């Protein structure tokens, strides 16, 4: 068996990336954003092709991400922020609801969304993970944007003339 294998493509040239950052836990979000922007640059994404917006907190990420996805101006989106456990049930609500919104937007629109919302127990944990998560989200966004483009169906009138992955020889089955 010799399967067709799509390898990860981390070339960000020509990609348009939208970033939504929650301002709650500002220091963490800023560290994530800086690392994310640096990594996008290393991957070849032009800074003019990146839009950054901020929202009050993690629960508001979904609204901004949805609007950006609906614009179809972006190849991928990135959500950044931090939810740090407190003494109430609020942590679970915010963590679960923000993650669900982010996933739903990606699935409903087909626009990849890298979820960089840290859910941690302490400020120290958030600080230790912020830069790494920001850079990771840049890589995820670029890879998934390229994968989505590679998996996009081609529009052609004569499918029998091309050599697409899904074309098989007619062996009478």
From Swiss-Prot:
InterPro entries listed in its UniProt record: LS, LS/RS, LS/RS_sf
GO terms for molecular function, please?
6,7-dimethyl-8-ribityllumazine synthase activity
Entry binding sites for (2S)-2-hydroxy-3-oxobutyl phosphate: 87-88, 129
The record's keywords, sorted A to Z, are: Riboflavin biosynthesis, Transferase
* Pathway listed: Cofactor biosynthesis; riboflavin biosynthesis; riboflavin from 2-hydroxy-3-oxobutyl phosphate and 5-amino-6-(D-ribitylamino)uracil: step 1/2
Summarize where 5-amino-6-(D-ribitylamino)uracil binds, as residue positions.
Answer: 24, 58-60, 82-84, 115
What is this enzyme's EC?
A: 2.5.1.78
Q: Give the residue ranges for region: Disordered.
A: 150-173
A GO CC annotation recorded here is: riboflavin synthase complex
Q: Name one GO biological process term.
A: riboflavin biosynthetic process
Where is there biased composition of kind Acidic residues? Answer: 152-173
Which reactions fall under this protein's catalytic activity? Answer: (2S)-2-hydroxy-3-oxobutyl phosphate + 5-amino-6-(D-ribitylamino)uracil = 6,7-dimethyl-8-(1-D-ribityl)lumazine + phosphate + 2 H2O + H(+)
Give the main EC class: transferase
The active-site annotation reads 90 (proton donor)
Name-wise, this protein is: 6,7-dimethyl-8-ribityllumazine synthase
Q: What is the lineage of its organism?
A: Bacteria, Pseudomonadati, Pseudomonadota, Betaproteobacteria, Burkholderiales
Question: What gene does the UniProt entry assign to this protein?
Answer: ribH
């Amino acid at each position: 068996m010799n399967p067709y294998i799509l390898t990860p493509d981390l070339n960000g040239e020509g990609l348009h990336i939208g970033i939504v950052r929650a301002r709650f836990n500002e220091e963490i979000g800023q560290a994530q954003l800086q690392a994310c922007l640096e990594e996008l640059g290393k991957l070849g994404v032009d800074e003019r092709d990146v839009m950054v917006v901020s929202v009050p907190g993690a629960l508001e990420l979904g609204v901004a991400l949805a609007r950006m996805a609906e614009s179809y101006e972006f190849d991928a989106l990135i959500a950044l922020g931090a939810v740090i456990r407190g003494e109430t049930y609020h942590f679970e609500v915010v963590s679960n609801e923000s993650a669900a919104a982010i996933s739903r937007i990606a699935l409903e629109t087909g626009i990849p969304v890298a979820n960089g919302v840290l859910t941690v127990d302490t400020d120290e944990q958030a600080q230790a993970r912020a830069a790494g998560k920001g850079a990771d989200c840049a890589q995820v966004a670029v890879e998934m944007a390229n994968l989505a483009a590679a998996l996009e169906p081609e529009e052609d009138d004569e499918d029998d003339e091309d050599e697409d992955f899904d074309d098989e020889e007619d062996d009478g089955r």
